[in-house]
UniProtKB/Swiss-Prot annotation:
This is Large ribosomal subunit protein uL5. GO terms for molecular function: rRNA binding; structural constituent of ribosome; tRNA binding. InterPro entries: Ribosomal_uL5 (IPR002132), Ribosomal_uL5_bac-type (IPR020930), Ribosomal_uL5_C (IPR031309), Ribosomal_uL5_CS (IPR020929), Ribosomal_uL5_dom_sf (IPR022803), Ribosomal_uL5_N (IPR031310). PANTHER family: 60S RIBOSOMAL PROTEIN L11-RELATED. NCBIfam families: PRK00010.1. GO terms for cellular component: ribonucleoprotein complex; ribosome. It comes from the Bacteria. SUPFAM superfamilies: RL5-like.
């Protein structure tokens, strides 16, 4: 038998009942859930050096556990010295078990390793129940070996939920122990 991800089990047992009581849902299917987590790494330096892109792909593969898709420039921009079709980044979409395992590692291991971390910005919700955040250094992930990296790159993390409002999404992510800052603290 395949073992279920720890956070998925926690969601099914505890989070669903807590959310049903708090928001008075009539059905279990109304309870918001995390649909996907998207990781995006923009690699502007890849324009000058193609090896940088390969290192970014390796890092993203180690962080996410699956091979990323290379994103290409949609149009040429002379100011950035890029042409249409050139690789400028990579992204990964995590769903199901891998998504819950990544979220578990993010909350319990990675975020506590971020330098001067005081919590995530509660204003980063988009109005429709999705949360976006950025990590400035990929080396905070335990999968990345600091001595073997070619440079420090950041990445964006988008958590897409089925919540209709920011309040529901915030309650859902707080139930998963995502460390959001208090509004009164700066």
């Amino acid at each position: 038998m395949i073992e279920m991800a720890r956070l998925k089990e926690f969601y099914k047992k505890d989070v669903v009942t807590m959310m049903m009581k708090r928001f008075n849902y009539s059905s279990v299917m109304e309870v918001p859930r995390i649909l996907k987590i998207t990781l995006n790494m923009g690699v502007g330096e890849a324009v000058g050096d193609k090896k940088v892109m390969n290192h970014a792909i390796e890092d993203m593969t180690l962080i996410s556990g699956q091979k990323p898709v290379v994103t290409k420039a949609r149009k040429s921009i002379a100011g950035f010295k890029i042409r249409e079709g050139w690789p400028i980044g990579c992204k990964v979409t995590l769903r199901r078990e891998r998504m819950y395992e990544f979220l578990d590692r993010l909350i319990s291991i990675t975020l506590p390793r971020v330098r001067d971390f005081r919590g995530l910005n509660p204003k980063s919700f988009d109005g429709t129940g999705n949360y976006s955040m950025g990590i400035h250094e990929q080396i905070v992930f335990p999968e990345i070996d600091y001595d073997k990296t070619d440079g420090i790159r950041g990445l964006d993390i988008c958590i897409t939920t089925s919540a209709k409002t920011n309040e529901e999404a915030k309650a859902l992510l707080e139930a998963f122990n995502l460390p959001l800052k208090d509004k009164d603290r700066k």
